[in-house]
């Protein structure tokens, strides 16, 4: 199975470009569709391997047959959005590393806060 995996920072960049162009009414026609993504399809298993590498753990996989309504491969057609200046730059591996680093830091702070709260509540 292949998908167009895109780092959230690249999506935010694209949204900002579309909004800027819409507000300035330079290139963007209102009510049109502007796709965001990388424009490249990648294997789901490659994505999972990158995630496993970054987490230092092997995922427990449960392989199932494809659902009849599922699509084997998808990718965004970003040609219209590229004309506005959108160009995703984050690789899958870099995006996963950025996300895992953020996730660990965010939940470390959340865990520290919860532990402090528990110590304050203790009687």
Pin down the residues of each PLM region:
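C-terminal substrate-binding subdomain of Rossmann-fold SDR/epimerase-dehydratase oxidoreductases
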Residues: 1-123
